[in-house]
C-alpha cells in the first residue's frame, strides 16, 4: 500500500493541526485539483479518522486508501468519483 501513497499527484501535510483545520485545508487543496487527480493527506489529529472519510462522502470524492493504525495517519483521495 505504501507504493499507492507514493504515487499521489499532490500532498498535504496537516501534521500538528487540529479540527477543523485539516479538513479545511483538504477542501482548499482539492478545489485547486482537476477531476481524477489524487491527494495524499498526512495528519496526526485523531478526528481526521472520522472527518476525512465523511468529507469524501459528502463532497463526492473517492477515499482510495487510508492508514490509521498509527500516526502519522495517511489518506489518499481522488477528486470526484
From Swiss-Prot:
Q: Which GO terms describe its cellular component?
A: cytoplasm
Give the keywords, sorted: Cytoplasm
Give GO terms: molecular function aspect only. sulfur carrier activity
The main location is cytoplasm
According to its UniProt entry, the protein's GO biological process terms are: tRNA wobble position uridine thiolation
What does the similarity note say?
Belongs to the sulfur carrier protein TusA family.
Q: What is this protein called?
A: Sulfur carrier protein TusA
Q: Where in the cell is it found?
A: Cytoplasm
Q: Tell me, in a sentence or two, what this protein's role is.
A: Sulfur carrier protein which probably makes part of a sulfur-relay system.
> Which residues constitute the catalytic centre?
19 (cysteine persulfide intermediate)
Name the CDD domains on file. Answer: SirA (cd03423)
The superkingdom listed in its UniProt entry is Bacteria
Stored Pfam families: TusA
Q: Please indicate if the UniProt record lists Cytoplasm as a keyword.
A: yes
Amino acid at each position: 500500500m505504501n507504493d499507492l501513497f507514493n504515487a499521489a499527484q499532490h500532498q498535504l501535510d496537516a501534521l500538528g493541526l487540529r479540527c477543523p483545520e485539516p479538513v479545511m485545508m483538504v477542501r482548499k487543496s482539492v478545489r485547486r485539483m482537476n477531476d481524477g487527480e489524487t491527494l495524499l493527506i498526512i495528519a496526526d489529529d485523531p478526528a481526521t479518522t472520522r472527518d476525512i472519510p465523511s468529507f469524501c462522502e459528502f463532497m463526492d470524492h473517492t477515499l482510495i486508501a487510508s492508514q490509521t493504525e498509527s500516526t502519522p495517519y495517511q489518506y489518499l483521495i481522488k477528486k470526484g468519483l
